[in-house]
UniProtKB/Swiss-Prot annotation:
It comes from Mesomycoplasma hyopneumoniae (strain J / ATCC 25934 / NCTC 10110). GO terms for molecular function: GTP binding; GTPase activity; translation initiation factor activity. Residues 145-149 are annotated as: G2. PANTHER family: TR-TYPE G DOMAIN-CONTAINING PROTEIN, TRANSLATION INITIATION FACTOR IF-2-RELATED. Residues 220-223 are annotated as: G4. InterPro entries: EF-G-like_DII, IF2_II, IF2_N, P-loop_NTPase, Small_GTP-bd, T_Tr_GTP-bd_dom, TF_IF2_bacterial-like, TIF_IF2. Its main location: cytoplasm. Residues 120-127 are annotated as: G1. Residues 256-258 are annotated as: G5. The keyword Protein biosynthesis applies. GO terms for cellular component: cytosol. This is Translation initiation factor IF-2. Residues 111-278 form the tr-type G domain. Residues 166-169 are annotated as: G3.
Amino acid sequence: MKKSQKRISNVSEIKAQLKTVETKVHNGVFLFSGIMTIAELAQKINVSVNQIITYFFHQAKMYNLNHSLSEDEIAEICLEFGLDFKKEVQIDASNFMEEVSILDQDKDLSPRPPIITVMGHVDHGKTTLLDYIRKTNIAKNEKGGITQHTGAYQVVFQGHIINFIDTPGHEAFTQMRARGAKVTDIIVLVVAADDGVMPQTKEAINHAAAANVPIIVFVNKMDKPNKDVDRIKNELSALNIVTEEWGGSNIFVYGSALTGQGIDTLFSSILLLAEILELKANKNRYPIGTVIEAKLHHNKGTIATLMVQNGTLMVRDFIVAGYQYGRIRSLENTNGQPIKFAPPGTPVIVTGLNYVPEAGDKFFGFHEEKFAKQLALERKQSEKISKTKVQTKQQTKEKTLNIIIKADVAGIAQALHSTIEKLASKQVHIHILHSGVGIVNKADILLAQTSNSIIYAFNLQIPAAIKAQAKQAQVEIREHTIIYKIVDEIKKQVRGMREIRYELQQIGTAKIIAKFWFSKVGSIAGCSVLSGKFVENCKIELWRNSKLIHSGKIESLQRDKNPVKEVQVGNEFGTHIYKFNDIEIGDELKAFLDVEIEE
């Protein structure tokens, strides 16, 4: 990028889209931004609180004026009173990174390098593949084939740049997704030709599916004499990863990370898929991207690896990441060489931040310190409010029970998978993100944390370290040794999650034939049952001269001064209406009972 080239400011883009939604009726349309109380809604749409409460009473919902209505309930009331409605998203410091749309014109866009994450089962050759690609000896010095560090680097193939995020197993990938980061464009899934699909292979596929990231399969160890390619294809097709040779959509590359066989084909396949994905960005704007890793150095302070996904990052730029801001002091490429700027699709090592951002934090770059500082301050102040909004929003969505199954043998895992899926109801969907064999591990905890899942462990010993990690991540692990107990537990959960629907059915009518006053209680109505029956604590409507006067419930039911459970037609009883004393002889009472509607 030329030094004289002026970058488009992110400040103007964000300021233009920050908006406060004014809750009001405009041209017959009720505009609102989220939940509100009955009292607030009544005032805004100019109807009485009683009208709204009565509406929900007939829906078998006993609300008061301070009850907070969900967005769906607000929509119901609007329809009931003849109003159109529109929910508008309020954009402020707390959510601008998620809600602001950075719209670049087509003429300003140019292709950017793809960002790749390599995943696979331990010892299937992931580290060896990365090592061969970057031509270092890291793999030789690492224990157990498990990567001991994180970061990102670039390779050049036939004049094209390809970015690789080097992560320890699946954890970093999942942590980033947990924080809402969409940084990976393509996953390269490494599967050993002599070993086939293993538990971590399935985990990687589930992670990719949950993040909606396409997969290229690299069948490794093709130099081994006991390779079985057909087995690999069959096992992967059972997991919806189907080779193009069989009419599927997944590219399969065959090779050896040890000898380098197939690496060029892998690069070509990555570039082909990247072209299909049309990965483009605008280099002539201030930067937007994701934090890959960050750590505190005893001499240099915070050192962070950032992936620039749009725009160009330069020294002295101010960035907001997470809930703080800082200024870039230096830029280095992943080889440790100083650079002047980092265009889209570039991993870059930066210094100058006075805090340590978290992996997966999105960042925005600015030229104005005042604006960056203000945004960071407001984001920090609204963090708790923002979390509350997210929780409330999730409560209004379709209810889903997310489950991860781990068992000691494959047959049990499959049986549990099949049985549990059948326990879903019309209101509650059961989503089994992963089922596998073996102990619960860190990847399971992270997947559960990301997807708000419960882990069911059958006939397994859970290591203390895993239990501690689960507790810290607020992930539930439920241990069982009897299948039917898991089934019973999930049935109860589904029932508890579903919105129980009731139908308010009229069960009787009565006439007030006498009234009395007791100072400790209030008005007592002497009634005669004209039809049906009255039962203890039933809901009632009080009618006078064909007008509805009150909706509520009876607080007591007595015959001959003795409490009774119910009173049948033709009999008399005394009752007090809860928090209501304005009764008259001749008033009619209608009794109602909530009846649960079966799905």
